[in-house]
A protein has these predicted regions:
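Short alpha-helix capping/helix-loop boundary micro-motifs
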Residues: 61-77, 319-321, 360-368, 496-504
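Exposed extracellular interaction/assembly regions and N-terminal maturation sites
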Residues: 304-354, 386-390
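Acidic, low-complexity/disordered segments
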Residues: 1-23, 119, 126, 142-143, ...
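Acidic, glycine/polar-enriched metal-coordinating patches/loops
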Residues: 341-400
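Beta-strand-rich assembly/attachment modules of structural machines
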Residues: 2-165
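Charged- and aromatic-enriched interaction segments used to assemble
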Residues: 118-287, 586-590
Length: 590
């Protein structure tokens, strides 16, 4: 995949659209990644697929005609055997230089016996997939008769005091290097939303103040015998939403990173070029996959200490917890039955250790009035931070006994309609109070995309309920709300898509921004490539791409980035002029 497409690349593609001349280069690698042979083949047929939504990102199959027949025997010492890997590239002939320009297709492992040779047609069939197959148990990666544990922290065996919290990124690196023997990797930080520079201008300050917790394993992780290396890696990846893992095509580096937002990315390929190589267009939408509400049920919260003895006076919850001694300890989780609803900036005091504030984990802001409901059990996590060389203790609200959050895709307009609940109360349809009541969920967030065809106001409620499995790793309502927003965004963006077929474009990759004007529209829009399929027999590329809807609100007028409203609050709306809001609602770019 070329990071920058040159004019030469575009000219070669345009020339090949009418008279394609291709050559496949296969380098055979040993277990150390060293080249031990080379097969230059003429392509009879074959295909390659790249799917940004799949753990196995790249697969390929080829029917080729080798030039050196002695290298294709299926024997232990041949170039096509179980212990061999291959690195492939495809060459397009450049009439100007009278030579081939090669584009990398990545490194692969054989997924069947290794290949079949047909003496009648003199053809070789190769089926393969990327190196994730070495981690998922297909070729390697299944672990033997042992239980693997990753504790959340190390503690003093005598006192039980926490010595060190274990970091998610370090656990991923340890898994790769010790269990898979992969040292060629690039692992980015995995952690809390507000600790990421993509989402918070003050991310460095947040990391400093939450040094012990922002990127640490939230609870002990244990994996049974027979699991795969990939299943362990996925568990750590999915502790927080919006991360991906894959092997890149250039150097076969294992990469773990946030899914690119593409906010500030330049257009990789523009509409004018795509129109010149366009063959067909398909805008079919699979309505069975459309969802506009995501409801996430997370972890059933297990607390270290619990008490039903609690009073509420002067906006302070005072509780006595037997066995909780001496002082607040960093990382302790506490369950308390709340006697009364709270006012703004509520505080808590346990065993007279001192009054501390109650905060939301997602934004580090004090909880708002009526966040805590009477006679409900809530869990809090104690966190100590170093601020100006002093310890600052806060209680972070994890949620009720089971983590629960909802995200709703809406156009942000009031319905003006009312429905009556079983207890006789009226609620405005699709209001926050409506969803809180009828979904029995306190944490309800809205994603507002004014021009989406899939909002609840247009299609009604189509829920996507996430429960069990990886969602049991979500440890607070705030984290569940982040995950619900991410899942709902995927649901709406992946259904608002288009598939086009073009002349062969071997330099493409997923998560790239392009501009394109649909045949039934008079305007260009920005899209993100989600999957690619190359057909080397017909010399075509099929591209599936989804409409670019930013996940989080951001103003980048100087970048020309398409804008939508992602939060429905006065504070956000006040950032825009009346003309800008009109442009956003109509789908224009700022």
């Amino acid at each position: 995949m070329a990071e920058i497409i040159t004019q030469e690349d575009l000219l070669i593609v345009l020339q090949h659209a009418s008279n394609p001349i291709l050559k496949l280069n296969i380098e055979v690698l040993d277990s150390e990644g060293k080249i031990i042979g080379n097969l230059e083949c003429g392509i009879q047929s074959g295909s390659m697929s790249i799917n940004g939504q799949s753990d196995i990102r790249r697969t390929a199959n080829f029917v080729v005609q080798p030039t050196l027949k002695e290298k294709i025997k299926l024997t232990e010492n041949s170039l096509l055997w179980l212990n061999k890997d291959i690195r492939m590239s495809v060459g397009l002939y450049n009439p100007r230089t009278k030579d081939y320009k090669y584009y990398p297709l990545g490194c692969y492992v054989y997924t069947d016996t290794s290949g079949t040779y047909d003496t009648t047609t003199d053809n070789l069939t190769i089926n393969c997939a990327d190196f994730m197959k070495k981690l998922d148990g297909t070729k390697n990666g299944q672990l033997g008769a042992l239980i693997i544990s990753y504790p959340a922290y190390k503690e003093n065996e005598e006192t039980g005091e926490v010595i060190e919290y274990n970091i998610i990124r370090n656990a991923v690196i340890e898994t790769l290097e010790k269990l898979a023997r992969i040292t060629n990797h690039r692992i980015d930080d995995i952690g809390e939303f507000y600790a990421m520079p993509e989402y918070n201008d003050a991310w460095e300050q947040y990391r400093e103040e939450n040094a012990d917790t922002w990127n640490t394993i939230p609870f002990d992780q244990e994996f049974s015998a027979g699991c795969s290396v990939l299943s362990i890696l996925i568990t750590f990846r999915d502790l927080y939403p919006n991360y991906e893992m894959f092997f890149d095509m250039e150097s076969n580096t294992f990469i773990c990173q946030m899914v690119p937002s593409c906010y500030e990315d330049d257009i990789y390929i523009d509409n004018s070029f795509l129109q010149r190589v366009l063959i067909s267009e398909n805008t079919t939408v699979d309505m069975t996959t459309v969802r506009n509400i995501c409801e996430v049920w997370g972890k059933v919260i297990e607390v270290d200490f619990y008490s039903e003895e609690c009073t509420y006076t002067n906006n302070i919850y005072s509780s006595t917890i037997p066995g909780y001694e001496n002082e607040y300890f960093n990382g302790d989780s506490i369950g308390i039955k709340i006697p009364s609803a709270n006012l703004d900036n509520a505080q808590i005091s346990i065993n007279d250790f001192g009054v501390i504030g109650i905060f939301n984990e997602a934004n580090d802001e004090p909880i708002k009035a009526n966040t805590l409901k009477p006679n409900e059990i809530y869990a809090f996590k104690i966190k100590k931070k170093r601020v100006d060389k002093q310890d600052v203790v806060k209680a972070y609200l994890l949620g009720q006994w089971q983590v629960h959050a909802i995200n709703v895709l809406t156009n942000g307009k009031k319905s003006g309609k009312f429905v009556t609940s079983s207890d006789g109360e009226e609620y405005e349809l699709y209001s926050k109070e409506y969803f809180q009541k009828f979904y029995n969920c306190e944490r309800v967030d809205f994603t507002i995309i004014a021009n989406s065809p899939f909002v609840v106001e247009k299609l009604g409620e189509i829920p996507d309920i996430k429960v069990s499995g990886e969602f049991e790793n979500i440890t607070s309502n705030d984290l569940a709300a982040d995950r619900a927003k991410w899942e709902n965004w995927k649901n709406c963006r992946l259904t608002d898509n288009i598939t086009i077929t073009t002349a062969l474009l071997p330099f493409l990759d997923v998560n790239k921004k392009v501009s394109y004007k649909r045949s039934d529209s008079d305007r260009e829009h920005q899209y993100i490539i989600s999957s690619i399929s190359h057909d080397f027999a017909s010399y075509t590329t099929t591209i599936t791409m989804y409409r670019f809807y930013p996940l989080y609100e951001m103003i980048l007028k100087e970048k020309g980035t398409h804008k939508v409203l992602s939060e429905f609050s006065h504070g956000v709306l006040s950032k825009y002029t009346h003309e800008e809001l009109a442009a956003i609602v109509s789908g224009d770019e700022l």
